[in-house]
C-alpha cells in the first residue's frame, strides 16, 4: 500500500499528488529528455499525465468536473539531462490539455523543473492544485 493518498481536499482547494507519465497500455513512459526522448514526445507524455490528473480530479469532485472552479497551479518535474532546458515546452503538453478541457478556468500558475530522476524512470511527473465550487 502507498504511504500517501492521490488527493487531499482542504476547504475549497484540492491538492493532487504527483502523477507519472504512463503509456496507453499502462506501462511507465520511461526515459530522459535530452537523451532518450525529444520535446514532442515529452509533450505527449505530459498530455497523458494531464488525462490521469483529470481522472483523479474527477474522483475528488465526486464524479462532477463541473465543480472545478479553477486549475490553480501545476508543478511539473521533467527527467532531464543537465543541458536540457526545454522543460517548459514539455509541460505545455499538460497545460494545453487543461485549457482545452476547462477553458478559461484551466489557465493556471505553473512551475517546470528539470530533475535528475523520477520514480520508476518516468520521463515526467506532474502535480496539480485546483479550486472547487
Model regions and ranges:
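Short, polar/acidic, helix-capping and beta-turn segments at strand->helix junctions
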Residues: 1-133
